[in-house]
């Protein structure tokens, strides 16, 4: 009986600590978003970075990547490219570790990281590195087999081409995007709904 009380207290303490850590990470992210809305970018960046670290510690990969990408975007906004690239490298390493640990791929998380890296290369006017990231983004979107990511990729691809003066290729990407929207509108379920009515 006496041995079970300390064990029970230890388990209870661990559960309370874990709950507190989760709530703390969520609170940091909420505060970061509020500061971002107020255009307090430095404070928002700091809070996103703290939330990223908290979520990474908890192995909450989706939230960690979300916060990491937001913090990176704020570094990039202030021309702190070294810090932004380093944070994205760390986020990518976190995702790779999570994939190995869970034996599951996270193409949607890789997509977010690659897209932010692409935006930074576009801002730096580095077409070669931007094209490499665009190719990685395409591979990731295909691996995800997700319509939303596929549409996001086509829009990003068009933006890339227009930014670097390749207007005909940008037009082609937009046409593909429009075709995907048209196909989505005329899916078999939608056609059956039209026939029924």
Task: Set out the residue ranges of the language-model regions.
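Bacterial Sec-dependent N-terminal signal peptides
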Residues: 1-31
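A "functional boundary" signal
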Residues: 20-197
């Amino acid at each position: 009986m006496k041995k079970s009380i300390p064990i029970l207290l230890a388990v209870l303490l661990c559960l309370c600590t874990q709950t507190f850590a989760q709530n703390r990470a969520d609170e940091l992210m909420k505060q970061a978003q509020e500061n971002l809305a107020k255009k307090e970018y430095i404070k928002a960046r700091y809070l996103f970075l703290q939330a990223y670290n908290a979520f990474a510690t908890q192995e909450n990969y989706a939230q960690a990547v979300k916060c990491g990408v937001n913090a990176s975007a704020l570094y990039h906004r202030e021309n702190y490219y070294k810090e932004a690239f380093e944070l994205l490298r760390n986020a990518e390493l976190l995702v790779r570790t999570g994939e190995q640990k869970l034996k599951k791929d996270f193409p949607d998380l890789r997509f977010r990281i690659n897209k932010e890296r692409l935006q930074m290369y576009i801002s730096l006017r580095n077409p070669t590195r931007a094209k490499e990231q665009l190719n990685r983004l395409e591979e990731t979107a295909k691996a995800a087999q997700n319509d939303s990511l596929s549409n996001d990729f086509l829009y990003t691809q068009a933006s890339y081409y227009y930014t670097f003066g390749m207007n005909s290729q940008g037009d082609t990407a937009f046409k593909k995007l429009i075709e995907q929207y048209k196909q989505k509108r005329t899916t078999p379920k939608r056609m059956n709904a039209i026939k029924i009515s």
